[in-house]
Amino acid sequence: HNWQVEANMEILRGWTMTAAFRYTDVKQTSFNTTANEWQLRDKPLQNKFKGIITTSYQTPLKTWQFDLTAQFNGEGRMPDGFVVPEGSSQYTSHNGYIYHKWYPQLLGQITKFFRTWSIYLGAENMTNFRQDNPIVGERLEAKDERYVNPQSANFDASMIWAPIHG
């Protein structure tokens, strides 16, 4: 189930604002080996909600445009067997399941319009939010601890739910 609400408003001539909110309730049936039964639960790595607020200003001659977007990404359930990285505060637990917490992002763009083309300068993830240890596995001790051994039995690069670059 999904639902979305959006509102647009012109504050002043050339200055607009948009706010949107999306709620997602996606379930899946899976077998719980601990309880020895089938259960209906949240689909893994699916954000429960996303909110966006965008403000945009275009100059009177329409030669420049400035955009700023704040984005709020909701929590989502992690797959079964996921182990919270040591020292991480980016996760919480509900009803025995691990969820990643919500996180904000800020994006900006400046656009210069010419007669038949345009050029822009943009920035993403200006809040510098990054997922802790996005690649799961044993760390290589011989090298920098940031490196994960791709040959380790628990290596998993599919648990990405947030930006990994600032």
Question: Residue locations for each model-derived region?
Answer:
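Extracytoplasmic gating/loop element in the C-terminal half of outer-membrane beta-barrel translocons
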Residues: T69, D80, V84-P85, Y91-I98, ...
